[in-house]
């Protein structure tokens, strides 16, 4: 039977932190030849979230359902599939809004989809409010304004503008002229350019999609994703207006949600919502793009509006443990737990290795590399040395699907394991026991009940949902019990004379620093964007 330890008790697991990517039961993709030629994989994208009856409901692409949580950390899955044919999407880039005690829900369509509704969504049952929407709307988003008027924003294209329209709440038919809201201007906005580093001006024109509108202090903030979901620079920008249908003006600080570096990369095509305490959050799409270009995960980032009405998100340390809300936050820069990464580049051993999938891949801070054991059998293990006594506060286990045979959603998927620690590498003590776990936790995050001072950590497999025991990241967080690195010196920015949208940033290496955060913005007090650089002194 599963044991509680002084560091972890599965029956009383109420963490005060969470860690991106979000630990959701990501659905496996359908068994279609163009999707799975490199093997079965999980994915979702295009998330949005609403509060309904005091809980958070998260909707995202092709999940055969949705997720709900009371605390933004522990998530439960509800099966609510709408797929009609095996080759169809379930719901792509879904949209939802709440009116009174009713949750309304739909997905992307070029041919018309129902508008579903429910007053008990956790049952997974929905009724049809409208049999078929009147407009072909891909990537829809709704805004129910304070005056009761309903608006829809939509579009996904590298050729056409994103649009907005007012809808009749009785039948969801348009009752206004369809307005073109915005198009990309990559010639002016360098971050909107196509490519992994905004560096491809020849393959395709950049894409814009994922319209979403947030109303704050009487202003309408129109958010949009660009330049492509398969890139680490995928981000959300924002335009602002005094009216729900515009005209909208490009915000000087852009993109407002941006994360091109670190373990989790990409922060585009998302949605903004308020928590129970009035804090804003932005839930966004993260790139993985290993087995397939549209292989993706989801991240959740604190978001705010400054005294000048500038909308921004905080993605600095955005894939480290972040504090879950317990009240109103005065400054979203203070949502970082302070627990640093202890596992980057550290030595790793394993029970076995499948081909060239080496254990070192779990400590390189790349979600796009992974280690795999030769099997998924109980007893396969992975061990890390922290190269000295460290204070461990949290552990993130990023599983990867290697040789998996699962497709679509199944309700019998779960992970089971035990984690041990040792100071000398010889004598081991149980830290975390999830040998009875019945949840699917592909990015499991464990916050320890008290600090653990140790040198070695080992995870022993008991069960994986499908395929081999494989991981892209065995990430250990805490404190190194040493001195903090000194501040960076000799920071230089060289702007390209040929193209002022480009710049090279360099700095001197700092002893004992394993990574750097570059902060930048439109003013000294608005350095809202951050780029994490690991093991290098240039970007």
Predicted segments, located by residue:
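Predominantly extracellular/luminal regions of secreted and cell-surface proteins
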Residues: 163-174, 330-364
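Short S/T/G- and acidic-enriched coil/turn segments that sit immediately N-terminal to beta-strands
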Residues: 237, 415, 442-445, 535-539
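Recognizes extended acidic, P/S/T-rich segments that occur
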Residues: 517-539
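Beta-rich carbohydrate-recognition and catalytic domains
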Residues: 2-203, 215-262, 277, 285-330, ...
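Short beta-strand elements bearing conserved aromatic residues within extracellular beta-rich modules
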Residues: 165, 417-419, 516-518
């Amino acid at each position: 039977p599963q044991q509680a330890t002084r560091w972890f008790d599965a029956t009383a697991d109420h963490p005060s932190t969470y860690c991106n990517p979000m630990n959701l039961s990501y659905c496996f993709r359908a068994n279609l030849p163009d999707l799975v030629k490199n093997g079965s994989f999980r994915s979702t994208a295009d998330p949005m979230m609403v509060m309904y009856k005091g809980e958070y409901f998260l909707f995202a692409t092709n999940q055969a359902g949705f997720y709900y949580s009371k605390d933004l950390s522990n998530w439960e899955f509800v099966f609510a599939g709408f797929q009609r044919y095996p080759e169809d999407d379930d719901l792509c880039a879904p949209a939802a809004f709440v009116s009174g005690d009713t949750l309304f829900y739909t997905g992307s369509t070029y041919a018309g989809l129902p508008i579903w509704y429910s007053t008990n969504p956790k049952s997974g049952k929905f009724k049809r409010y409208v049999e078929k929407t009147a407009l072909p709307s891909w990537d829809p988003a709704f805004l129910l304004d304070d005056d009761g008027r309903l608006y829809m924003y939509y579009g996904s294209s590298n050729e056409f503008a994103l649009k907005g329209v007012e809808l009749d709440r009785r039948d969801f038919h348009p009752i206004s002229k369809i307005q073109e809201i915005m198009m990309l201007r990559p010639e002016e906005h360098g971050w909107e350019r196509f490519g992994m580093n905004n560096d491809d001006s020849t393959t395709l024109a950049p894409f814009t999609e994922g319209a979403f509108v947030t109303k704050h202090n009487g202003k309408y903030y129109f958010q949009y994703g660009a330049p492509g979901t398969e890139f680490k620079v995928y981000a959300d920008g924002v335009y602002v207006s005094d009216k729900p249908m515009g005209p909208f003006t490009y915000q000087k600080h852009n993109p407002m949600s941006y994360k091109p570096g670190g373990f989790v990369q990409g922060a585009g095509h998302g949605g903004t919502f308020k928590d129970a305490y009035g804090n804003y959050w932005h839930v966004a799409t993260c790139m993985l793009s290993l087995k397939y270009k549209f292989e993706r995960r989801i991240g959740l980032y604190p978001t705010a509006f400054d005294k000048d009405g500038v909308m921004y998100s905080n993605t600095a340390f955005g894939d480290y443990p972040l504090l879950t809300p317990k009240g109103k936050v005065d400054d979203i820069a203070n949502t970082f737990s302070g627990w640093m990464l202890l596992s980057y580049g550290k030595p790793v051993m394993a029970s076995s290795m499948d081909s060239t999938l080496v254990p070192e891949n779990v400590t390189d801070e790349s979600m796009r590399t992974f280690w795999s054991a030769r099997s998924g059998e109980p007893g396969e293990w992975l061990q890390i040395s922290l190269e000295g006594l460290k204070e461990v506060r949290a552990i993130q286990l990023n599983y990867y699907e290697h040789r998996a045979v699962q497709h679509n959603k199944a309700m019998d998927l779960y992970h089971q394991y035990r984690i041990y620690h040792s100071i000398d590498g010889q004598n081991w003590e149980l830290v975390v026991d999830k040998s009875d776990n019945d949840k699917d936790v592909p990015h499991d995050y464990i916050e320890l009940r008290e600090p653990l001072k140790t040198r070695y950590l080992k995870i022993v497999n008991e069960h994986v949902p499908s395929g081999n025991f494989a991981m892209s990241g065995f990430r250990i967080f805490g404190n190194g019990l040493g001195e903090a690195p000194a501040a960076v010196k000799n920071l230089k920015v060289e702007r390209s004379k040929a193209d002022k949208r480009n710049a090279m940033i360099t700095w001197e290496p700092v002893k004992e620093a394993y990574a750097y955060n570059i902060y930048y913005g439109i003013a000294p007090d608005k350095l809202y964007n951050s780029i994490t650089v690991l093991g290098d002194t240039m970007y």
